[in-house]
Amino acid sequence: MKKNYSIRESVFIKDSLNNSFMLFKDNNENLLFNKINIDNSSMIIDKDIMDFSATIDENNRLHLLYLNKSGELIYCTYSENAWHKNLIGRLDIQSNMYKYLTLLIHKNTINIFYATANIINLNLWTIEHIVKNIDNWQKHVVTNIFSDKTLDPFYIDQDEFGNIYLVYSGKESVHYNVYYLFFNTFNKKWAPNPTKISSSFVDNILPYIFVDTQNNVHILWYCSNNGEYLLKYKRFSSIGEDKFHWREIKLPKITGSNSHALMLEKYNRLNILYAERNEIYNLVSNDHGNSWILEDKTSIVNHPLYLVQYYNLSLNRLRHKINHYYGSIDKASISFYCDDFHEDLKEFNEFKAASLKGEKDSVKDDIKDSINLEEKENKAKSQAPKADKKGHKTNQR
């Protein structure tokens, strides 16, 4: 499977007042912040950015974490139309690589995650977890991962109590496997040993984890099968016959993707989104993941495709939960595939497009009027009586 590392990442945040914000890196590695449906203003937060992550807390405060090319790990909060920056520390980017910054907040606890490896040995990666409670920072080594020089992204999620769940893929002997780990928020400890989710006899890559509104844990990944890659799915339930056991559930045949399949919950129905052959497909389950049907699909209209870190405080948390969406960003406008939550964004994008068209038409009319005026002046000059050498006007026929 050819992994699509060209997919770009961004962050979309909607607060409880329906104000929408977007953060993303441009082609010059500037970190941009847009207030989408407020005044459509855009600002550069910082330049030469290596990686970033952002979120919002229950009090509508935006939080941002980013690493720049000077090795500065900077933590920011947004208030009074400004980002307030604090230097957490300096990372040794000359000797080490740092990837997949992830910021997670539960109540007053700040969680920071990243993967790191020494540039001399990029086959051994470590996931580290930094926790802040009040004024104290504490670092945990979550796990070590054997991999090739490129490491698949890890993903995390949390339940309503603040327990954290993590999934990653690592190399065991000659094959890649998918592993799961759990952080207990009450004793502040990670499980000592990861749980293997996949088979050891084939390659398993691109894992994704999702915790639904009922605190059930779901993992998606791709598994090699006779030259193809099939989407696999397991669920860890907190209730029912399979309580506290991992159960594999059969999906319709979904082959060879080069990007992560995503899971989300809308109207208490689980959805699986995946990209394939220039289209986004949407599978739906009405029975908590036991069975799945294809509900719709839509063409990818703009490239690159964006994997959007998604937060929306305006949604009913008892019925909806979305961590990521696939989307499109065009001139500071954002849209989401297989989406029915953002009529305000659609209206704003349509209004913006109409405004731009109006401006273009106005410019065209101004140019046309200028050309017509110039043509009239030239015609008038050509029809005016000419003077002879003595300065007398002569009539032309």
Residue ranges and their predicted role:
Residues M1-R397:
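Extracellular, repeat-based ectodomains that mediate carbohydrate processing or recognition
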